[in-house]
Amino acid sequence: MNKHDIAQNSNLEEKILNELQKNCRLNLDEIGKKCGCSRYKVARIMKKLEEEGIIVGYSAVVNPTKTKFKYFILLVKRTSQPFDEEMINNIPIMRETDFVPVVNIKSIATLYVHGNYDWILTFTAPDIADAKEFYNKIFKYYNKYIENLELLEIVLPFRMHGFVMAPDEEIKNFTKIL
C-alpha cells in the first residue's frame, strides 16, 4: 500500500468515526453514503477499528435535562504523597469497580489532567445530597492523597458529546443573566 492509499484510508477512517460519533445507530448503508464508500468497506473499517481498540464501545448520549439525574464534576488536587502498595492494588481506575462503597452515583469519566487539578471525575446523581455523599466518601477514603476537592454541579448543559442539550428558550433565558 502506497502513501496515498494509507492517507486515503486514514481519511476514510476519520469520516466513519465522525459519523459514528454523531449517530452510532445509523445503518452501514447510510454511513457509507455519507463517507463515499460501500457498506462492506464501512463494516471492514469498523471491525478493524474495534480490533485496534480505537472503537471501544457504543453508547447512548442522554440529555440530562430530560432525566431525573443531575451531572456533577469533582475536581481533585493530589498531595505529593506517593500511593502506597495497598492503594495501587485497590485504586479503581483500570477496572469496573466503585471508587467508594455504597453511593448512589453513576461514574461517567475519570480523567487525569494537567493544570490546577490532577483528576476530574464526572458523574450523575439524583441530587446534590448524593453528590456530596460521594464527595465526602472520596475525601474519607483517599484523604492522605488529596490536597483539595471541589464539587461542581452542572446547572445547564448547553452542549454534550456534540449535541445541543438545552432547549433554545432555556438557553436564551440563561444567557440574559450571564
Q: What are the residue ranges of the model-derived segments?
A:
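A compositional/biophysical signature of low hydrophobicity enriched in polar/charged and small residues
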Residues: 1-178
